[in-house]
Structure formats: C-alpha cells, structure tokens
Amino acid sequence: MESLPTTVPSKSERRARSSKFSQSSSKPSVIMAFFSCVAWLYVAGRLWQDAENRVVLNNILKKSYDQKPKVLTVDDKLMVLGCKDLERRIVETEMELTLAKSQGYLKNLKSGSSSGKKLLAVIGVYSGFGSHLRRNTFRGSYMPQGDALRKLEERGIVIRFVIGRSPNRGDSLDRKIDEENQARKDFLILENHEEAQEELAKKVKFFFSAAVQNWDAEFYIKVDDNIDLDLEGLIGLLESRRGQDAAYIGCMKSGEVVAEEGGKWYEPEWWKFGDEKSYFRHAAGSLLILSKTLAQYVNINSGSLKTYAFDDTSIGSWMIGVQATYIDDNRLCCSSIRQDKVCSVA
C-alpha cells in the first residue's frame, strides 16, 4: 500500500496560528481591564463625592453650633444685661436691711408727737376725693380739731385722714386736698399712691409704711370713714392690749370667695383659694389693728407683698406667713349688737 503523504506546517504557518491564538485570548483580558478601570473610577468618584458631602455637612453643623444659644452663667447674664452695678446695690440693700432689722426695723425714725415720746396708736381714717362731707361729719363727731387734736396727740393718739394722689397729678382734686389739709392739718397724704377704686387694696401697704416711717407707736389702725367710731372706747381697748407683740386685732371672719365676674366682692384670683372657695381667717376691713412689729413687717416688705381684690383679705394673707397673734375682739365688729362695741355702721 502506498502511504499517505504527511504535510508538515511550515514555520511561517505556525507563527500565524500562534498570533491568532494570542489575539483571541487577549480580548477578554482587555475587556476585564476596561471594566476594572470603569469600576475603579466609579468607586473613586463616589468616595470623592462622599468626602465633599461630609465637608458640607461639617460646615453646616459648625454653623448651627455657632448659632445655638450658649449656656450662660449668672455672671455672663449680669454682664450682658449690664446689671453688675444693680447686683452691687442689691447686696448693699440686703446689708442695710439686716442692720435695720437688728435695730428694730426702724431707720431715720420721726416722731409725730411734740414731746417725742412713743405713741399709743396711729389711726388712719380712709377717705377719698369725693368724701368731703363724710370727713366733715367725722370731724364733727369723732375727730377733735385744733387744740383738741394736739391734746389728743399728747395723750399718745395720732389720727389722720388717709388719701392718695390723683391719677392726673396736680389737678383740681389734688389742689382741693392740699387746701383742705392746709386749713385742717389732719391729713396723711400718700404721695406714691394713686387714689382709685381699683388701687384700694394697695393703699393699705402705703398707709402702714407711711405711718411707721412718720410715727413710733404701739399700734397702727386702719378705719373706714363710713362708720361711727367711739374714740374713747377704742383708746380703752388699746390700753388693755399694751405689750402684746405681733398682735393682729379685729373682728375676725371668713367666708365664700366670689368667683362670678361682675358680682359684688368679686375676687379675680378666686382659684388660688382652693376648691372650697373659702377665705382664710382675717380681720374685717372696717376697723383693724396691727401692732408695731407687724406694721414694720408690712413697711419693710411692701414691695413684695401680694395684694388681692380687697385690703382686708390682703392683710390676712400677709399675716398667715408670720408669727402673728390673732385676736378676735367682738367690740370691733361694727355690725354686731354689743352695747360696748367701739364702732357701728353709719
């Protein structure tokens, strides 16, 4: 048999085949490298973007932190408000108050009596601009005039009509009171008090403060000008109470707090008196008496004492917070039927 001829590839053919094989095998590598570069660029771009976002976020947080109110100390607040000088004056006032308390609460005391001796009582008769006739009636019945008034003061009793100033300072109302006082010399004019119905509860603070600052007495008495007063009977009652420290004397009462707006005796802050809506025990406002120490307490703390709609309940609220001795004396109940009472409803 004849053998088949064998074809041996030439050298050039082997090179061509090798080149084709290498070209076909390198294409996937190039593609993979390309996608790797794309992925790297994508990741790098995201990282760069995240870095920029973090920078922006940090700037925002820094700005918001700078704008956030800082926690200030008391000294910082005082500096901001310019209150350093006020702080110093408060400390000085507290020191003066401590000194005043140690000296019996009184400073630069002026005596209302000609002899300078201590008085038994200062009686303040509440009056108003439209009460000229009432004052004349009171003078004609219970209040001495001229030399008799001076003799009464020598006995240790000072009695004055108590009135504030007009809302329109210096008007005809003020001038009439000044003229009446110049003629009668029986007024205690409260220069810092505005005489008005809605300010009546505050008037009692100004009265006790002015009375304490002008006269040194054992008792300070608030009286309405619409009652009949037995002056000698009142003096006898006071004589029997001499030496009773921190005495709060009057016709003690309590009663329902009126919560209906527009009603008589309406109390705007009725809710402060509890669910039962009942007033605490207090002396009726027609005639009430404070001993020297209690009147001094009102004088010293008048700037911070809370007032309610009426002066008698306001005083009663002040007495709750101190060691006051409550004395319920029926002779001071002006509407009672007792024969020895010292006042009665006019």
From Swiss-Prot:
Gene3D superfamilies for the chain: 3.90.550.50
E.C. code: 2.4.1.-
Spans annotated as Disordered: 1-21
Tissue specificity annotation: Expressed in roots, rosette leaves, cauline leaves, stems, flowers and siliques.
Feature: compositional bias, Polar residues: 1-10
Pathway: Protein modification; protein glycosylation
GO cellular component terms given for this protein: Golgi membrane
Taxonomic superkingdom: Eukaryota
UniProt membrane topology term: Single-pass type II membrane protein
GO BP, sorted A to Z: arabinogalactan protein metabolic process; protein O-linked glycosylation via hydroxyproline
Residue numbers on the Cytoplasmic membrane side: 1-28
EC class (word): transferase
Localization in the cell: Golgi apparatus membrane
The keyword Metal-binding is assigned to this record: no
Matching InterPro entries: DUF4094, Glyco_trans_31
Effect of deleting the gene: Reduced levels of arabinogalactan proteins.
Regions of this protein lying in the Lumenal compartment: 46-346
Similarity comment: family membership: Belongs to the glycosyltransferase 31 family.
Function of the molecule: Possesses hydroxyproline O-galactosyltransferase activity. Transfers galactose from UDP-galactose to hydroxyproline residues in the arabinogalactan proteins (AGPs). Is specific for AGPs containing non-contiguous peptidyl hydroxyproline residues. The addition of galactose onto the peptidyl hydroxyproline residues in AGP core proteins represents the first committed step in arabinogalactan polysaccharide addition. AGP glycans play essential roles in both vegetative and reproductive plant growth.
Protein's name in the database: Hydroxyproline O-galactosyltransferase HPGT3
